[in-house]
């Protein structure tokens, strides 16, 4: 089947769309277009803003005129995404809180929050298709694919901007729980080590401790000690990529079943005893100021069955 956007047309940027990256704006506006095609037409200059070429990092300004060229795409009807009743039920069961401004979910481990790196549809893309009545849906923050827990989605652009401002000003408080290898010492309460994002052939994003990196601070509290493991509560003061996982590895208390920053030989016992392969890191709660209700909101996400089963049966 061939789908066509048959003629050149222009979009004028309003207040609801300003400050977005052009690639994200186009992905939300033209949901049928594959993201790699969006990147290509930007890169080749087919997308113009105010008659000028731009790159995909360009942030839209109020009043910008975006030129959209004619586009033809081939689609295989057998490969259409099937968002059936079962998937709708799965997403509905994730809901922790919802009002006219926010949708807050308990994200399962193993589910990507957005497309990219070989994933055509993440949670946010699926939600936009499942919920056409929500004119605007966007991620306030991100969680790693393997991390479970609280995920906030904004229903209005103005709400997204407000929450991003709260994040920048460190007014949003997040707490995580993790099962780590080793018996955690009572005196260890925090770590402050700079983190630098690098790349390698095997992994696109690898984060390491480096003096050239950004300031990164994480606080810890013990929840429960086991014979060879500890369940800890974690409060990241800064919000760097993979911050918790890298800091814990540096302290020699890696998270159980962390495929990227863990230690496989330590994971062997739990992996085989419980027949699991998920990172035991969970975004337990988030506390933020609701800009419309004018009060603080605390959202808590319960652990899933797998995580609870491991804790229940550990000695």
UniProtKB/Swiss-Prot annotation:
The active site is at 144. Keywords: Isomerase, RNA-binding, rRNA processing. Residues 20-90 form the S4 RNA-binding domain. InterPro entries: PsdUridine_synth_cat_dom_sf, PsdUridine_synth_RluA-like_CS, PsdUridine_synth_RluC/D, PsdUridine_synth_RsuA/RluA, RluA_PseudoU_synthase, S4_RNA-bd_sf. GO terms for biological process: enzyme-directed rRNA pseudouridine synthesis. Its EC number is 5.4.99.24. It catalyses: uridine(955/2504/2580) in 23S rRNA = pseudouridine(955/2504/2580) in 23S rRNA. It comes from the Bacteria. NCBIfam families: rluA_subfam (TIGR00005). This is Ribosomal large subunit pseudouridine synthase C. It comes from Buchnera aphidicola subsp. Baizongia pistaciae (strain Bp). The gene is rluC.
